[in-house]
Amino acid sequence: MKCVDLFSGCGGLSLGFELAGFEICAAFENWEKAIEIYKNNFSHPIYNIDLRNEKEAVEKIKKYSPDLIMGGPPCQDFSSAGKRDISLGRADLTYSFANIVCNIRPKWFVMENVEQIKKSHILQDIINQFIDFGYGLTSAILDASYCGVPQSRTRFSLIGKLNSEHNFLIPTLSRKLSDKPMTVRDYLGNSLNLEFYYRHPRNYNRRGIFSIDEPSPTIRGVNRPIPKGYNINSCDPKGVELAKVRPLTTIERSYIQTFPKSFLFSGTKTDLEQMIGNAVPVNLAKFVASAIINFEKEPIRSMG
């Protein structure tokens, strides 16, 4: 199936869908640093467009006649990782995503976002819009560690299919979930040459040290060194030698996001940390894409 990626960032969603067997025709993004990385890793075009300009976007997307439109509208207005202030103006891009999809009416769409979007009236607004335009909807909160990602990262997915019943994809998604969460060691073995690592907590009441024998916490857009005189938190693993603890490097964090070692990253540390932290984990995207492909291959169900 042919698809286009809106708000593509550096390409986590694109790569996951490509690995699952989709043909990515084009991507759309307006952060130049992310566009440069995307171009270095994909052969199809990427357009530098502010998707608030819906007319221009629709004209370009229609040329590709996509079977599926996917995207993760910027989520800072919903995310607990940043200021949750819808007045800041990023949330209107969620409406732009819905407007573009409903104008083009591909057979499928996938919208990916943070779990907190469920608390926003915007989600109900666009759900009503999609239903009015004939989409059956499946919404799911997926823990990436059960979807082939060594990271406890919960994300919200809204998946639409024209002329379908609601919740149509739930059985397929459920069958594909792993029985247990994936740990860092499960995914990377001993290649990190460490047993414990530091992830800077949002506040010092939370743990900062993690074992590779558990899923990583959410990879965020910042990465800081362990402070001098770090006080062991009661929830940190017991018996850890602080002298042997370090934060993961930028590229190691991309591995936790399941970008392959062959994926080319370049740029400043600050930009890369933000790009990698904002990306949809590649294997989570592949998980959703594979569920769609499997659903398409299943025998036609009786409507009776």
Swiss-Prot record:
The keyword Ion transport does not apply. The gene is hindVM. InterPro entries: C5-Methyltransferase, C5_DNA_meth_AS, C5_MeTfrase, C5_meth_CS, SAM-dependent_MTases_sf. It holds the Pfam family DNA_methylase. Residues 1-299 form the SAM-dependent MTase C5-type domain. Belongs to the class I-like SAM-binding methyltransferase superfamily. C5-methyltransferase family. Gene3D superfamilies: DNA Methylase, subunit A, domain 2, Vaccinia Virus protein VP39. It catalyses: a 2'-deoxycytidine in DNA + S-adenosyl-L-methionine = a 5-methyl-2'-deoxycytidine in DNA + S-adenosyl-L-homocysteine + H(+). This is Type II methyltransferase M.HindV. It comes from Haemophilus influenzae (strain ATCC 51907 / DSM 11121 / KW20 / Rd). GO terms for molecular function: DNA (cytosine-5-)-methyltransferase activity; DNA binding. The active site is at residue 75. GO terms for biological process: DNA restriction-modification system; methylation. Its EC number is 2.1.1.37. It is an enzyme of class 2 (transferase). SUPFAM superfamilies: S-adenosyl-L-methionine-dependent methyltransferases. The lineage of its organism: Bacteria, Pseudomonadati, Pseudomonadota, Gammaproteobacteria, Pasteurellales.
